[in-house]
Amino acid sequence: MQFHERFDVIVVGGGHAGTEAALAAARMGCKTLLLTHNVDTLGQMSCNPAIGGIGKGHLVKEIDALGGAMAIATDFSGIQFRTLNSSKGPAVRATRAQADRALYKAKILNILQHQPNLRIFQQAVDDLVVENGRVIGAVTQMGLAFEAPAVVLTAGTFLGGKIHIGLENYSGGRAGDQPAIALAHRLRDLPLRVGRLKTGTPPRIDARTIDFSVMTEQKGDTPLPVMSFIGDLSQHPEQISCYITHTNEQTHDIIRGGLDRSPMYSGVIEGIGPRYCPSIEDKIHRFADKNSHQIFIEPEGLTTTEIYPNGISTSLPFDVQIQLVRSIRGMEQAEIVRPGYAIEYDYFDPRDLKNSLETKVIDGLFFAGQINGTTGYEEAGAQGLLAGLNAALQVQGKEAWAPRRDQAYLGVLVDDLSTLGTKEPYRMFTSRAEYRLLLREDNADLRLTEKGRELGLVDDFRWQKFSEKRESIELEQQRLRGQWVHVNSPQVAELNEVLSAPLTREASLEDLLRRPEIEYDTLMKVDGFGPGLADPLAAEQVQIQVKYAGYIQRQQDEIAKAERNENTRLPLDLDYSEVPGLSNEVTAKLNAHKPETIGQASRISGVTPAAVSILLVHLKKRGLLRKSA
């Protein structure tokens, strides 16, 4: 049966990738359909109730700078906010928020339901319609066919999902949800490389059975940060504490005693789990010399008694889970509300994707989220936004867009995936970026909002706030450069009290701010120098740009040097065995990866600078030298 309307973009799946994809396509004016197996689980936080963190917070800010929903929903649902690495430089500072699951999901649903051009329909998708190498629609489990020239697939852990608790297992997309078995079989018929990955979640504990008095209280930051560039402290709900406790030798003995019934250590699970979010079984095995591991006791919300014990993700049998939980200080009487489990699922090799997240073999078909081998809400949301905007661009007959590695962590993410692929769940860290000083949380809007406006992603309200902020920064920088202090100025005595060395020659306010011992706020308190900027985010931007100007310029020079051949296009149909001079190893790797640009080719392991030179000569001889936009 054919649905009576035709759409521009269909998004399959309503998790963090799917919601951002659907919102992006709709914001760009495309008639968009979001297909979900259950409207009540749109935007659901399936694992930990938190958004942000090192590397991840940077992605959230970038989603926000491009008009996405994740940061806004976090401000409305965050019950504890912290700035991680606050004592370190601005490049690695990151915002993290503990979120109320119910409030977060409710805000996402509210945003979806009020988005023009977006239709939501509840039905699981069983099939894709592909004709002549191009996707033209999707078919639901009741045989209802929807037509669209672009489809974004964001199936999360649902493709062939199998849940494991001890040696027992059953099919499931996550606890309480059916898997997408028919769709998984359909995708395996396509000429795409497929693998299996695994992730897991800890048991949920009833807070009424926990003794918090013997744990270490962890409060949020004061003053509170906000997640969105258009966020406001008044949006935050009540703020509460988290707590910290630890495993012990008894805990570890219990876990070791249960490993013979662990699906991971008995060969039942074949999928590879996340390296940077290991199960407690993995921790005990890999770090056998440690007699204790930290556990963060995180509330799941303001109106629930469920607690998320971050750090004891497990798929051990339920009886072992009870023992290990009750061996932990403060949880001796704990009751488990939901058992922990592991889930195995299909993912598709992201090397089969373009940087736009469109598949290289099926035109109009885009993948985003865990289907690409990533882990985390933030990584999924960022990919969803990129896939959604590129699906819209394709429908509109426009050229695809993806940020470069020097423009955004999103650029690092998609370049890593499409160039190198992954054999384990991929998590974003600041260490993955070469140009961290340029890719800070605080300047995500300055890096991306103008591009978002050009693409049609950024609404008038956000654009006005951004424009006002950008203008105020520029005007303040001009003022600091133009206002001078002479040695005999009346402010010098006051200044010398905070300077490490007395002022001996005239200096501009910018020169003074460049000194490591001077903060912007301190400078503005000197008589005649203020009042300065009222917006603390704009003031922070002025300070960072002045103090790090030399380092920033150095990184920009490095980028300009690297860009000479970075964006030189490589034909996707190029047979590298026909390029004379390449070694067999390089030929095999290039034919397997099919890089889109010289820059991507150069980052493939084993592709030498000499091989890159050979490629450039070959392209020049064939008249194929051209740059991407």
From Swiss-Prot:
GO BP annotations listed: tRNA methylation; tRNA wobble uridine modification
- Localization in the cell: Cytoplasm
What is the protein name given in its UniProt record? tRNA uridine 5-carboxymethylaminomethyl modification enzyme MnmG
Q: Where does FAD bind?
A: 13-18
One GO cellular component term of this record is: cytosol
Q: Which cofactor does it need?
A: FAD
Please state the protein's primary subcellular location. Answer: cytoplasm
Q: Does the keyword Flavoprotein apply?
A: yes
- Name the job this protein performs: NAD-binding protein involved in the addition of a carboxymethylaminomethyl (cmnm) group at the wobble position (U34) of certain tRNAs, forming tRNA-cmnm(5)s(2)U34.
Task: List the GO molecular function terms.
Answer: flavin adenine dinucleotide binding
Which family does this protein fall into? Belongs to the MnmG family.
Under the heading Pfam families, the entry gives: GIDA, GIDA_C_1st, SAM_GIDA_C
N-terminal signal peptide: none
Mind telling me which SMART domains this protein's record contains? GIDA_assoc_3 (SM01228)
Q: Which UniProt keywords apply?
A: Cytoplasm, FAD, Flavoprotein, NAD, tRNA processing
**PANTHER family, alphabetically?**
GLUCOSE INHIBITED DIVISION PROTEIN A (PTHR11806), PROTEIN MTO1 HOMOLOG, MITOCHONDRIAL (PTHR11806:SF0)
